[in-house]
Amino acid sequence: SGKTSFVKAGIFNRINNKFQGESGNNWSICSFRPGLSPIENLCTALSSDKLLYLNSKPNSSDYDDYLETFKIKESFGLLDIFKKSEIFGKKNVLIHIDHFEDIFRYPKFYDRDMHLDDELFIEIINKTIKNNSCSIYFIITIQSNFLTKLNSYGTFSELLSLSQFNLPNLDFNSFFYNIKNDLKFSISPNLIDSLENQLSEKPSL
């Protein structure tokens, strides 16, 4: 239903347009998928694009340093990394976790370390959200048919339910209706028919 596009084209633009957060209206934003190794992929996202830097150059050891921090601090690792960064108290951080269903999609019952990695990943988010003095925010996108799997994570599931938004599936006509109303421009009916035919033949477009 276009969750990723909605976040990146809509919410990110709004955030970058001086949206007020706990640490002012300046933001660092990253987006990643949990995949098979959510902690490692989080470290990759945190060490990319000067996310946690103001003027200094990132260190080549950042990824390894962050990974080590999570091993030592566990669920408080992200808070520790952020509080030691240049942007702490100066910028907000928005972390978009895309395709959160990756956590449940890949069978990991045969690998205890990978299963524990998933549990730690969820606890990292949980502990960070509950810390009111730290300006880290999360957007989590997940397929609706995986939502019930979050129920086994207790308070984490409860926290998500307080700010849950279901993005409805739009058919072609509804999609263009919303565009016309939101962006205030008209589209030739012939062009709409042509696009609809092309999309029905090649949905991947």
Task: Give, region by region, the residue ranges found by the protein language model.
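Amphipathic helix/helix-loop-helix segment enriched in hydrophobic residues with interspersed Lys/Arg
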Residues: S1-L205
